[in-house]
């Protein structure tokens, strides 16, 4: 190792290595690794800069700030503000120097090298402050939303949403809240284009308010029949088609070690059921369609009588049927619970919800409310929480009012459906992956999972790659998955589904309910393009999809009207799930709580890549947990494990040289490569072409049946095959077909 840092860069003559700097010239700014050489390179691109060097200096506040030193190329000294703006065009916001010092000459060591220790200290009184507070109403609102969505104490004017930990999905929540608070209609794309508090507030302050009016989400009088939300309606239809399928069951099993107060637990769950209406709602059908019937809390029976199990095997035999048992949501409350007693101080609490009542983002508020209620009940009192500002039924009414009808061409629903019809027009019906078995005519929900890991170093490189290209880790992962799917299928027009939380309004944060929607991400992968180009394309694709994510997936399917099949899911067969929802931690007094595998795995499509970020105590990337879920109807674990290996290999390759053509990425390695590599030695195989083999067979036994040419009752001899082949060759020659010509068969 030399310590020199280089990167691949495209040029007219092909890829070249570009020197970036030394690895010992790196600093951490607000948790981000900064290559100082990249800042220097940006500065020296200015015509009036002959030389530049950047250091990390400690400000009086204790923060590390970037200070650049510049030697002018002539007598005309460049303006510091102009240089700062120049640098902004080449590096992310966190790499813009806090100040720039203009030098008359460079301090050198006795051997003629730059003496970094002799560079003058900057005047910290004029250094750009690390934190600038908001002043206007728009700035205050944007800063508050950034802090709220990202779980921070505060956000300053110069803080970048994505540098603070934002991502594609949290960006949609932030924009929705800013729009609601300020009465504007900003899009997710604008947050990517103006990611700092100051920049986005400036756009909000000048945004057109004439088209921004949306009804506020508030508690309001309900009609006699409350309709389902659009997401619930899809769940209801799926459930009525097959009430026995566990595909949309959400099982949660927790091992509680310690003295469990059963009565307090029973009362706590009663409190939670009363607080969250979806947990006590049934959805009967009628001639006018299904509707919500919210039951009184005392009508919901929770049987928490402990059932004794002898060992782990007996525990498993209880959990699996509990997790996979059917719900008929038209008459059954979409929740069941059981307590399994392993010993005096060891229990497993199993909770199963139907997806019509809860999604992944519901787990955190559900866990918090159970904690509060159980703690209160162990002290002999009810939980003292404030009433919910709105309930799920309020959301269902608000959603339908906001989206409007697809029969109204001016409605939001119609506008978004038009977008999807244009975007998905002509998309291939099916992505054919290499499988271990033929696809059955009727797909089942049987699934399994292959977990794998992405190391901390690679995680950090991926984060840096995303930041350098004004994208997010989700977008980089999506692009890498597209490369993998393109290689596996041989296709260039690919579709991947991804869930979106659907919780833009702050009133929905603490609610248990079904808000999630699925959008289709259509990507075109050109082998000659670089990964950098693909990330830019994916960025546009994803931003467009997230900006039109309110129309339910089933309505998109109806509008696009693809060829339907019971053998596969419509529009996409691969799902990408980026789990960046709030972690649901459950801590109960006097108990150690551990998650238990409920033992039921389902496959909603052929392949599902799930990714989750891990960070260390300082917020630095600490690796990613990953898993490929797959349909066992068509795939084996060994095959999917190979997919995982190839995916990690792609991530390594694109972080090492993002400008390399993606068609040049080597996705096969190790044992796979050995299987494909000819073994040196052994029996020699003569290099004889197929026409030569046919000619030899014609001479040796012209009237023998050509085994490769049998169609029904018709069989050709080698002589007949040779004659037919010659006739076809003459026809092609007469048509002007020559070597390397492409001919449709």
Predicted regions and their residues:
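Regions immediately C-terminal to embedded phosphopantetheine-bearing carrier domains
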Residues: 93, 118, 125-242, 263, ...
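AMP-binding/adenylate-forming domain of the ANL superfamily
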Residues: 2, 108-117, 121-122, 129, ...
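AMP-binding/adenylate-forming catalytic domain of the ANL superfamily
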Residues: 50-53, 57-66, 78, 91-114, ...
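Phosphopantetheine carrier-protein modules
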Residues: 20-25, 48-54, 98, 143-166, ...
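Adenylate-forming
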Residues: 3-7, 25, 41, 51-59, ...
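AMP-dependent adenylate-forming
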Residues: 1-135, 139, 143, 162, ...
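A short N-terminal helical cap/helix-turn-helix that marks the beginning
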Residues: 88-95, 136, 150, 185, ...
